[in-house]
Amino acid sequence: MIPKIIHYCWFGRGEKSKTIKKCLRSWEKKCKDFKTIEWNEDNFNIESHPFVKAAYEDKNWAFVSDYVRLYALNLYGGIYMDTDVQLVKPIDGFLENEAFLGFENKNNVANGLIFGIEKGHWFTQKLLADYDSILYVANDVNFRMKNTNTERATKILVDMGLKLNNQFQIINGIAVYPSEYFCPLDVNTFLMHKTKNTVSIHWYEGAWTSARYKEWKRQQIRRNRIDKVRCLPQRMLRKFLGDSTVDRLKSKIK
């Protein structure tokens, strides 16, 4: 059984944003009897692994976190979440799994959305061992894209039989949930697909991302809001008149 410990990483000693503080408060509210551990420069030895040391010197906090989350989960077990993950429901029901995580989309799983696992599990040990043969490369976009935890975790599970179909599966004891559970916000469109099964929302705050990406994200969200307002009259008509009536009226207008 997965222990009631929540791990998160905060390296670089920067100020936490309002979104991140809101997400952390949601953990306290939904997981009142969980222990929470913040991993940072004070309780993790940056010099303990060459990959972490190089990533830290490059101020690539995301890659530092990629390693440290696995270290923490392997040592203690528990739950890891990125700091921009908001809980909307309790997670106690998932603790009966020996390990669980979720699809980010139909193409990959992600262990930053929420990743629960028993201590000393083969999956964290395998992911950790990979870092012994990875040389960190600074300022290389191709390296960053190919060496995230998401990419490597997905590859391991696919090699063991995971089907990239965004459907619930259990692979060698690891429960993989559809994106509606832990990732209802589409990272490409920033459209929300929340359902009755949604447990958490990853807001893609991306503290390590570029200003260009953040501006693109703001513009995308703005366009989505404009489209939502523009389509409001038609949605209201469909709600009160029904789809068939609205479609019939539209065909007559044409």
Model-derived features with residue positions:
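Glycosyltransferase-associated regions of secretory-pathway enzymes
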Residues: 1-65, 83-254
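Small-residue hinge/turn detector
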Residues: 67-78
